[in-house]
């Protein structure tokens, strides 16, 4: 049966550039990959055709020869012949990302995005731990004890994965490189060795405790130092306290994500604190004093001058939060709220009415001026 046109196979025009070729190939390769269509001979055949078409057209020299002579350019043995199975057979579906799309995922033919390196050494995974602290703890700082479930190096086999007294052996399939080449038409593709999964070694007699993994799960207790002045959303990194690496690989890191609980009285903005304090109408009018307990446990006196208005702020210098890793302190801002009296007695009502009758514009300049300006605006 005559071969299909390579451009038609990929669904692109004969003027398609490299970007268009790659985009079309990725879409079709994902659709027809044998691992997504197990047992489907037609999908496997289609996948091989797509592979062959792309490998030809992405190479400028091969593409030029194909454009001039068609399939005849490669019919005399040319650059190789199809090998048994070839392509990605035997590999997991993730191989398509590792072998074809490696450059997109930070990998490449010397390793992959999962941290595996030549010889099978693999970095352990990073871990995340969420911790909630109070504003007082953020103010003073603290040392917290936490328990984290993680994977640690197996003590029985020292991380080798092999039963004590035995050793892993060099993989016979890839000769220890962790990579193999598979023929596909007139080209070859390098991919992860399916026998050793890229480790370069195989274990014939695995460790009984870790079952050949080289690490076991355990809950560890760690001490975390939280400095004073720490802010909500801060991330603390504990290097090497993540999961143990595989086959001698380095451990991952543990990241502590801190959140500071809302406080009943104080709101925080950077190193400054804000607190709303309600005072009586008479205190606002006549003046007075009140005490505020700050986060450090001390009391600070606030003097309210006569005629204080709602929203007035008083600054208590140095009574805010510590500035992280500094000797400086933020400030505490007291914002005044004036409470209107409720459930008045008859006598209280009479006195307020009398006060209102004898009040002048000078007593309420803002409200008097506001209504005068409004009247002038609308009536002209």
UniProtKB/Swiss-Prot annotation:
CXXCXGXG motif repeats lie at residues 154-161, 171-178, 193-200, 207-214. One of its GO terms (biological process) is response to heat. InterPro entries: DnaJ, DnaJ_C, DnaJ_domain, DnaJ_domain_CS, HSP40/DnaJ_pept-bd, HSP_DnaJ_Cys-rich_dom, HSP_DnaJ_Cys-rich_dom_sf, J_dom_sf. Binds 2 Zn(2+) ions per monomer. Coiled coil: none annotated. One of its GO terms (molecular function) is zinc ion binding. A zinc finger (CR-type) spans 141-219. Keywords: Chaperone, Cytoplasm, DNA replication, Metal-binding, Repeat, Stress response, Zinc, Zinc-finger. Residues 5-70 form the J domain. Its cofactor is Zn(2+). CDD domains: DnaJ, DnaJ_C, DnaJ_zf. The J domain is necessary and sufficient to stimulate DnaK ATPase activity. Zinc center 1 plays an important role in the autonomous, DnaK-independent chaperone activity of DnaJ. Zinc center 2 is essential for interaction with DnaK and for DnaJ activity. Participates actively in the response to hyperosmotic and heat shock by preventing the aggregation of stress-denatured proteins and by disaggregating proteins, also in an autonomous, DnaK-independent fashion. Unfolded proteins bind initially to DnaJ; upon interaction with the DnaJ-bound protein, DnaK hydrolyzes its bound ATP, resulting in the formation of a stable complex. GrpE releases ADP from DnaK; ATP binding to DnaK triggers the release of the substrate protein, thus completing the reaction cycle. This is Chaperone protein DnaJ. It comes from Allorhizobium ampelinum (strain ATCC BAA-846 / DSM 112012 / S4) (Agrobacterium vitis (strain S4)). The gene is dnaJ.
């Amino acid at each position: 049966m005559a071969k299909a046109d390579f451009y038609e196979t990929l669904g692109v025009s004969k003027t398609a550039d490299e970007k268009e070729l790659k985009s079309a190939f990725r879409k079709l390769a994902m659709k027809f990959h044998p691992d997504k269509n197990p047992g489907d001979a037609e999908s496997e055949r289609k996948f091989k055709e797509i592979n062959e078409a792309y490998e030809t057209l992405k190479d400028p020299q091969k593409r030029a020869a194909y454009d001039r002579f068609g399939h005849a350019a490669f019919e005399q043995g040319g650059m190789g012949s199809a090998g048994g199975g070839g392509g990605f057979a035997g590999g997991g579906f993730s191989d398509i990302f590792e072998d074809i799309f490696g450059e997109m995922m930070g990998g490449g033919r010397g390793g992959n995005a999962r941290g595996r390196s030549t010889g099978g050494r693999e970095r352990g995974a990073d871990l995340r731990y969420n911790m909630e602290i109070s504003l007082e703890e953020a103010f003073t700082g603290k040392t917290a004890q936490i328990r984290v479930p993680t994977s640690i190096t197996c003590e029985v086999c020292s991380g080798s994965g092999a039963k004590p007294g035995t050793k892993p052996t060099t993989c016979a399939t890839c000769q220890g490189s962790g990579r193999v080449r598979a023929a596909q038409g007139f080209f070859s593709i390098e991919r992860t060795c399916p026998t050793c999964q890229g480790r370069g070694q195989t274990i014939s007699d695995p460790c009984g405790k870790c079952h050949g993994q080289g690490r076991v799960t355990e809950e560890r207790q760690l001490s975390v130092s939280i400095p004073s002045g720490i802010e909500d959303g801060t991330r603390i990194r504990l290097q090497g306290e993540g999961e143990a690496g595989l086959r001698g690989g380095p451990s991952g890191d543990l990241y502590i994500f801190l959140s500071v609980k809302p406080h009943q009285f104080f709101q925080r903005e950077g190193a400054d604190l804000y607190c709303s304090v309600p005072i009586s109408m008479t205190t606002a009018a006549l003046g007075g004093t009140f005490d505020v307990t700050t986060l450090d446990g001390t009391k600070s006196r606030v003097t309210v001058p006569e005629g204080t208005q709602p929203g007035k702020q008083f600054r208590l210098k140095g009574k805010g939060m510590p500035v992280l890793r500094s000797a400086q302190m933020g400030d505490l801002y007291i914002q005044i709220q004036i409470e209107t009296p409720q459930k008045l007695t008859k006598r209280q009502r009479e006195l307020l009415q009398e006060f209102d009758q004898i009040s002048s514009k000078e007593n309420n300049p803002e409200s008097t001026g506001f209504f005068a300006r409004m009247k002038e605006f609308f009536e002209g």
